[in-house]
Amino acid sequence: IFTLDTGRHFPETLDTLFDTEGKYGLRIRVMYPDAAEVEDLVANDGIYGFRYSVDARKACCEVRKVRPLNRALNGAAAWVTGLRREQSQGRAHVHFATYDPAQKLIKLNPIADWSLATLEDYVATNKIPVNALHAKGFPSIGCQPCTRAVAPGEDFRAGRWWWEQGDAKECGLHSRPTAITA
């Protein structure tokens, strides 16, 4: 089990990591971005350079998220995610099992068809630690400077990169893999 720490997380996100480790008595492997790559990125683009363009934001996500993910998945046969179809238009067609050609592995999305209500019920029933930001209007939580609370009725991911236009607001972790059919 691993998670990504971009170096820009909310304190509540890190609290959730520690709470989860405590509840389940396990150590979650934390993958960090390469320090030299972050240093180069900030030196070239500035601390908030990701707000200048979609390409600049994607470059930041590449360094802080995608490359650490690639290192974590190196040699793995499968990857289990929490993607849900309800989260956004871009995720509306997520399959339970896919082949991810970028990672060369099977990607499993076991809660792909869960609604938010189903998820919340499962979490409450099983007393799973939850990021405190969810109760403050953050249905989707990423890096602190790239995430804001959403208004009631807004899309789950409307608070992510809100300064960008359009619906295709993904960081690059979840490409469009090929569905596995029986």
Give the ranges of each region predicted by the language model.
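Nucleotide-activated chemistry modules centered on ATP-dependent adenylation/adenylyltransferase
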Residues: 1-182
